[in-house]
């Protein structure tokens, strides 16, 4: 059917075009805006088109036959490509998963989601889509790389343009390929490159490819250990220390030599033994007795199944949370001990992992608790700074540095005060005149004894500029505990000073206090000997704790003390 002459379009003529009706309607609805700017020459004709529905309307359109013919050929090729055998799932294959823009190299491909593509802008902003997370491993897809080792001047972009141009222009049109490559390669070079790298199936042999997926995505191994690993697989060596530490775990079958609740099978053994005796007395039993016996046996089976389910539930928890390896488990637990204040509190909290099936969420919960603990300690440091009039972080650094210098100066002053009264010249003259080792004067010996005595342990102080402490008075220290110690926030000022002087951890002091107060509630009084019997620490520290609690009314002496 020719479009060079004016024709009146009817239903039969539209059917002869062999276009889909949707595409045909799209063509005719865009003719007005497309050809409105075309100059009207001597071949301008009239054209009438009809909509194929109950609201059919006729309109007069002016068109250029040459332009219309060219546009219809383009639409025919476009429609043929849309109706080709390309699956519908691949229509969005080259679009960004978040902003839906068309992708051009370079772009990002997720190596875990496999079908998620991102543009560089969305990737740099850390955007997520569907199951894709911004912490997944990724692959940079770019086409400015060299594909063939022997062709250093041909990039992947040039290879794609070459194949696409040959598909549209046909084999042998090397000039068109050279023009598509912006004359970067001569037609003879293009012909030589195609014959050397693509012709006759040599492409896969040059690149040593077996599957297109293997060039981007590594093969996934559905095993616990990698098949290509140089380390030997785990084996169940009964004599090894690792086997004993893992409670006899058999990795091949995923079970233990000594399973949990080893007496569960004894229920079935009791039933089997009883069943053997019942076979001998089966004739003498009544129907009621047989029903009762059967119900008892069913009850034993149900109890056995319940114990098996409990065993498998514990195995599942161990497998999900990775509790098989004892060394890793202990190191993992010790990582969060500080967040709970004590080992006992941490171990009690770990029992809640059985109600949290997702181990990642349980780890996130522990991390949040640890972060809460760190934030709590930081707030106490800021409270202490605010009490001393410090309002800025720069002032806090200056305060910590000056406080540390003041502590050191106070220690130096105390040490100097002990040695000022000693006459070094008198000591030197005595030893030079008396080399036989005779005892010196009483005053000199007493001073030497004072200098050589063991110094008392200094209180727990803040050092290194990392923590903050109170200002020191000229006569004594205003002691302060490290706020990071467990139980620090539960102490008042007097208890903090006691723990600092006695060098006690706040949580340990609270435990000792609870023991003594509990014993006081039982007996109505508390002796110092009873306190030393309950608290197995230094007797001097026990005396300090006892006197402190007695002074503040937490405990009382027996009536015989007067």
Swiss-Prot record:
Q: Which InterPro entries match?
A: ADA2-like_ZZ (IPR041983), Ada2/TADA2 (IPR016827), Homeodomain-like_sf (IPR009057), SANT/Myb (IPR001005), SWIRM (IPR007526), TADA2A_B-like_dom (IPR055141), WH-like_DNA-bd_sf (IPR036388), Znf_ZZ (IPR000433)
Cellular component terms (Gene Ontology) = ATAC complex; euchromatin; nucleus; SAGA-type complex
Superkingdom of origin organism: Eukaryota
What GO terms are given for molecular function?
chromatin binding; DNA binding; transcription coactivator activity; zinc ion binding
PROSITE patterns on file? SWIRM (PS50934), ZF_ZZ_2 (PS50135)
- Where is this chain's protein located in or outside the cell? Nucleus; Chromosome
Domain named SANT: which ranges?
Answer: 154-198
Induction trigger: Under heat shock conditions, strongly down-regulated in L2 stage larvae with levels remaining low during the L3 and pupal stages. In second instar larvae, down-regulated 1 hr after starvation and then appears to return to normal expression levels 4 hr after nutritional starvation.
For the ligand (Zn(2+) 2), the binding residues are 110, 113, 132, 136
Where are zinc fingers of the kind ZZ-type found along the chain? 91-146
Which GO biological-process labels does this protein carry?
Answer: chromatin remodeling; regulation of transcription by RNA polymerase II
Entry keywords, A to Z = Chromosome, DNA-binding, Metal-binding, Nucleus, Transcription, Transcription regulation, Zinc, Zinc-finger
Q: Give the matching Gene3D superfamilies.
A: 3.30.60.90, Homeodomain-like, Winged helix-like DNA-binding domain superfamily/Winged helix DNA-binding domain
Annotated residues that bind Zn(2+) 1 are located at 96, 99, 119, 122
SUPFAM superfamilies under this entry?
Homeodomain-like (SSF46689), RING/U-box (SSF57850)
Record flagged with keyword Magnesium: no
User: CDD domains recorded for this chain?
Assistant: SANT, ZZ_ADA2
Q: Which residues form the SWIRM domain?
A: 471-562
Description of the deletion phenotype:
Late-larval lethal.
Record's subunit section? Component of the Ada2a-containing (ATAC) complex composed of at least Ada2a, Atac1, Hcf, Ada3, Gcn5, Mocs2B, Charac-14, Atac3, Atac2, NC2beta and wds. Component of a complex that does not include Gcn5 or Ada3.
According to its UniProt entry, the function of this protein is described as: May be part of several different complexes, including Gcn5-independent complexes involved in RNA polymerase II-dependent transcription.
Additional comment:
This protein is produced by a bicistronic gene which also produces the Polr2D/Rpb4 protein by alternative splicing.
> Know the name of this protein?
Transcriptional adapter 2A
Q: Which gene encodes it?
A: Ada2a
């Amino acid at each position: 059917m020719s479009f060079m002459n004016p024709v009146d379009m009817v239903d039969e003529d539209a059917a002869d075009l062999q276009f889909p009706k949707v595409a045909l309607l799209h063509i005719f609805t865009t003719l007005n805006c497309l050809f409105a700017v075309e100059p009207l020459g001597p071949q301008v004709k009239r054209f009438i088109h009809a909509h194929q529905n109950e609201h059919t309307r006729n309109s007069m359109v002016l068109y250029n036959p040459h332009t219309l013919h060219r546009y219809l050929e383009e639409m025919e090729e476009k429609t043929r490509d849309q109706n080709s055998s390309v699956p519908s799932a691949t229509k969005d294959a080259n679009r960004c998963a978040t902003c839906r823009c068309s992708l051009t190299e370079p772009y990002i491909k997720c190596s875990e989601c496999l079908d998620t593509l991102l543009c560089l802008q969305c990737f740099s902003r850390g955007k997520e889509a569907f199951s894709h997370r911004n912490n997944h491993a990724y692959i940079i897809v770019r086409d400015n790389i060299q594909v063939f080792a022997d062709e250093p001047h041909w990039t992947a972009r040039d290879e794609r343009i070459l194949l696409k141009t040959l598909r549209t222009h046909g084999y042998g049109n090397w000039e068109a390929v050279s023009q598509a490559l912006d004359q970067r390669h001569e037609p003879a070079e293009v012909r030589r490159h195609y014959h050397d790298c693509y012709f006759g199936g040599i492409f896969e042999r040059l690149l040593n490819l077996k599957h297109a997926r293997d060039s981007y995505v590594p093969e996934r191994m559905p095993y616990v250990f990698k098949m290509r690993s140089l380390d030997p697989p785990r084996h169940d060596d009964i004599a090894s220390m690792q086997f004993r530490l893992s409670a006899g775990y058999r990795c091949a079958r995923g079970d233990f030599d000594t399973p949990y609740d080893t007496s569960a099978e004894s229920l079935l053994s009791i039933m089997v033994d009883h069943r053997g005796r019942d076979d001998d007395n089966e004739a003498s039993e009544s129907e009621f007795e047989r029903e009762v016996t059967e119900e008892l046996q069913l009850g034993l089976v149900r109890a056995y199944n319940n114990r098996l389910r409990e065993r498998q539930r514990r195995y599942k928890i161990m497998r999900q949370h990775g509790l098989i390896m004892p060394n890793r488990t202990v190191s993992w637990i010790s990582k969060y001990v500080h967040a709970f204040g004590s080992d006992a509190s941490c171990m009690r909290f770990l029992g809640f992992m059985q109600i949290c099936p997702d181990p990642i969420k349980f780890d996130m919960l522990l991390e949040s608790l640890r972060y809460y603990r760190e934030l709590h300690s930081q707030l106490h440091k800021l409270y202490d700074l605010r009490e001393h009039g410090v309002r800025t972080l720069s002032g806090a650094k200056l305060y910590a540095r000056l406080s540390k210098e003041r502590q050191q100066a106070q220690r130096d002053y105390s040490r100097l005060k002990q040695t000022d009264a000693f006459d070094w010249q008198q000591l030197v003259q005595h030893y030079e005149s008396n080399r036989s080792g005779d005892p010196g004067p009483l005053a000199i010996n007493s001073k030497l004894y004072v200098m050589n005595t063991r110094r008392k342990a200094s209180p727990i102080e803040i050092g290194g500029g990392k923590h903050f402490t109170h200002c020191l008075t000229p006569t004594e220290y205003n002691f302060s505990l490290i706020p990071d110690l467990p139980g620090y926030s539960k102490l008042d000022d007097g208890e903090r000073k006691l723990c600092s002087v006695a060098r006690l951890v706040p949580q340990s002091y609270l435990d000792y206090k609870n023991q003594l107060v509990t014993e006081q509630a039982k007996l109505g009084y508390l002796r110092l000997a009873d306190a030393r019997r309950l608290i197995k620490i230094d007797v001097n520290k026990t005396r300090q704790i006892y006197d402190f609690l007695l002074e503040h009314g937490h405990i009382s002496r027996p009536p015989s003390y007067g």
